[in-house]
């Protein structure tokens, strides 16, 4: 399935099959905090839906040797087969529990580093060098994986429940785009990151020294298109954040018109597009640009998460200097998120009351509320609850 994160039919595209929140609905969201009500997010427990695709790795991470990665509190080994396709197994040999990720790949088999036992992509032991017979009980879980775009996706739940392909982000490997990306491990529950990247109003405060975009103080329009959470917001003329000026070749002090658009097609991935318009471009220069942000989050161990981010510019090539400068600036901003979310997680986890205290919800939390509703629905479909 090919997913394009930008609205393809124009900047002022009307919402089709989507519902924008009415004034009464926004008041309802605001009143949730006043009444002490909230939708649980399960940030201290196992709040990971299994029957969905999660990103396991960037494709480049598994090309040279097996990769060990904790996913949904499960040790997984990811490796590449002879034809270049990915494979994933439980990262523990059933003999004496050595991590298979410390072994090596031989053909399409992964070899345990401890006693040389070999396992196929189905998790079956095909060879035990220290004896003639292969024990038929020597099996480990295997997980469906698929490469889509630049990422390897994994399905940790029931394989029979797979009903879609993972999201493919075409511009990440499109030569007409310049793509900057990074990864960090965050000591916070994944849902905190997901809510954070869908909340634009924190940027004017938490990122006042990095984004330097102080007009992000009002709530965007939040609506649904099918099962996709969407938001959109138009801004008056103002200088663009210095994080992205260099990538677009724009001066940091020039008033620019921009439209912010976001989509979350699944809990695992969301997109934030900057549609930028320069009303008075210099001679021979473009007037319109697009910057596409990508936010991928996958649960790791309890209270820890994997976070991949990307920033793509609709410019065929930017210099290494500009790419390095932009990446350093983005990392500095995201480290501000990381530091705050990690302290938030630690503070709540240390409180003996757990989650049993008031959480106020503001009108600007519309997208975050949608995240929690979707999360609780998916867990309910799997026979689980956070209540």
Each model region followed by its residue ranges:
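Rieske [2Fe-2S] iron-sulfur-binding domain
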Residues: 12, 19-27, 31-36, 41-48, ...
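Serine residues within intrinsically disordered or low-complexity segments
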Residues: 5-6, 24
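Acidic, Ala/Val/Gly-enriched low-complexity intrinsically disordered segments
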Residues: 8, 15-16
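Short, small-residue-biased leader/transition segments that mark boundaries at the very start
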Residues: 1-2
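Generic structural signal for bulky hydrophobic/aromatic residues embedded
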Residues: 5, 59, 96, 148, ...
